[in-house]
Amino acid sequence: MKAVDEKLANYQFEYTGTSDDDLLIGLESGKYDIGTKGAWYTDERAKKFVIPSEPVGASIIGFTVRKEDEQKYKTIDDFAKNKGKLVPISPQNAQWNVITSYNEKHQDAPIELTAAESFKVADAYAWVLEGRYDAFFDIKLSFEKAVTAEDGPYHQYADKLSWFPYKGIPTYPLIHRDEKGEKFAKEYEKAIKELKEDGTLAKLSQQYFKEDVFSYVDKD
């Protein structure tokens, strides 16, 4: 967003660090004008906030599996065809929609979706390790911070768990829904398109994530 800020001479950004809950409440109330939290597009969010047409980033989503199964499950198609059991997902979670979309396109070999309320990530990893489920639908950055990193809270599982990618999910800034927000969204879209076309977004992605996260996003 700082690169967007530099493009928009008519706007002066003031940055505030906060929790996800406060960000969402603040955006609805008008306390904040714009917020970024790696938010995916959902119809529910689009009713509450202005969501620009152009993403600011992407989350790489994939599957955490047991290391012993990393040759068996190399792609989402492998997982589906081998009838792998997926850790339950809340229907309110945007990840539910990703699997639902996959199943609609692969009705001959869908992934079984089980609805569940929220649970601790530690439980999901433990369930996979003990064989209760075969995979946890997990964001790459979350897996790296939680398991791969030496100071990660679940690093003790690093030699027992593996992760493979499925696709990139575009992430968007959320903007307070009012006339001012609608106007800003149009200015943002113009700026972000320029940053995309001149290669700035890809360079920033390489700088912070060591890869171009946009390359994982479907082009259709």
Regions found by a protein language model. Give the residues of each.
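Extracytoplasmic small-molecule ligand-binding "clamshell" domains
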Residues: 1-39, 198
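Hydrophobic residues within well-ordered alpha-helices
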Residues: 4, 27-28, 63, 79, ...
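Short helix-initiation/N-cap motifs at beta->coil->alpha
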Residues: 13-25, 111-126, 130
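A ligand-binding cleft/hinge motif common to bilobed small-molecule-binding domains
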Residues: 22, 28, 36-47, 97-101, ...
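Periplasmic-binding protein-like
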Residues: 57-62, 94-98, 151-189, 191-209, 211-220
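Flexible hinge/capping segments at coil-to-helix
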Residues: 66-87
